[in-house]
From Swiss-Prot:
<dbReference type="GO" id="GO:0045735">
    <property type="term" value="F:nutrient reservoir activity"/>
</dbReference>
<comment type="function">
    <text>Seed storage protein.</text>
</comment>
<dbReference type="InterPro" id="IPR016140">
    <property type="entry name" value="Bifunc_inhib/LTP/seed_store"/>
</dbReference>
<protein>
    <recommendedName>
        <fullName>Avenin</fullName>
    </recommendedName>
</protein>
<dbReference type="InterPro" id="IPR014710">
    <property type="entry name" value="RmlC-like_jellyroll"/>
</dbReference>
<dbReference type="InterPro" id="IPR036312">
    <property type="entry name" value="Bifun_inhib/LTP/seed_sf"/>
</dbReference>
<dbReference type="InterPro" id="IPR001954">
    <property type="entry name" value="Glia_glutenin"/>
</dbReference>
<dbReference type="Pfam" id="PF13016">
    <property type="entry name" value="Gliadin"/>
</dbReference>
<dbReference type="InterPro" id="IPR006044">
    <property type="entry name" value="11S_seedstore_pln"/>
</dbReference>
<feature type="signal peptide">
    <location>
        <begin position="1"/>
        <end position="28"/>
    </location>
</feature>
<keyword id="KW-0732">Signal</keyword>
<keyword id="KW-0708">Seed storage protein</keyword>
<feature type="region of interest" description="Disordered">
    <location>
        <begin position="180"/>
        <end position="214"/>
    </location>
</feature>
<keyword id="KW-0758">Storage protein</keyword>
<dbReference type="InterPro" id="IPR011051">
    <property type="entry name" value="RmlC_Cupin_sf"/>
</dbReference>
Length: 214
């Protein structure tokens, strides 16, 4: 969510940045001296951000932690100071500043943490090329998914477990692991339903009670 906020803010800054350019002979020329001024503001913002990263990270992000009471109040104040520095920047300098912040968010502070997108990419790259169990583990609805459904789960189970769980033979369990076409035979009842007759023919409730009492 934070990244999307940065991107939206970046779009607004880009639109405002073009207003700071002067058009000459069909091309845009940057306002004189803005580059040096932006570098000075960027150095201040980098120092502020690095200080926040050093003092206000949690154990999950950085090996150093500080007392909770100080962390809760002090870090919010430090972040507000960084936001004020960003707000004081000229509009033509904010574009690069926000883009650098996005890069830090994706890569983490000082390389100690991976951003959310980086973590997901790392997990995706570490998955094997062919693994039905991996597909089942990351599927949001594995029991009904055609790609990672019962087939992938059953293939991950030993033959003996399937045979005992569904009370089938080892050969049937082996066929079930390797062939989805056999699944319907497991999940359908093996008994046939018969019509229920409450009393035998020619007898009623009183006759049955008399037989039971004898």
């Amino acid at each position: 969510m934070k990244i999307f906020f940065f991107l939206a803010l970046l779009a607004l800054v880009v639109s405002a940045t073009f207003a700071q350019y002067a058009e000459s002979d069909g091309s845009y020329e940057e306002v004189e001296g803005s580059h040096d001024r932006c570098q000075q503001h960027q150095m201040k913002l980098d120092s502020c951000r690095e200080y926040v990263a050093e003092r206000c990270t949690t154990m999950r992000d950085f090996p150093i932690t500080w007392p909770w009471k100080w962390w809760k109040g002090g870090c919010e104040e430090l972040r507000n100071e960084c936001c004020q520095l960003l707000g004081q920047m000229p509009s033509e300098c904010r574009c690069d500043a926000i883009w650098r912040s996005i890069q830090r968010e994706l890569g983490g502070f000082f390389g100690t943490q991976q951003g959310l997108i980086g973590k997901r990419l790392k997990i995706a790259k570490s998955l094997p090329t062919q693994s039905t169990w991996a597909l089942s583990a990351i599927s949001p609805n594995s029991m009904v998914s055609h790609i990672a459904g019962k087939s992938s789960i059953l293939r991950a189970l030993p033959v003996d477990v399937l045979a005992n769980a569904y009370r089938i033979s080892r050969q049937e369990a082996r066929n079930l692991k390797n062939n989805r076409g056999q699944e319907s035979g497991v999940f359908t009842p093996k008994f046939t339903q018969t019509s229920f007759q409450p009393y035998p023919e020619g007898e009623d409730e009183s006759s049955l009670i008399n037989k039971a009492s004898e």
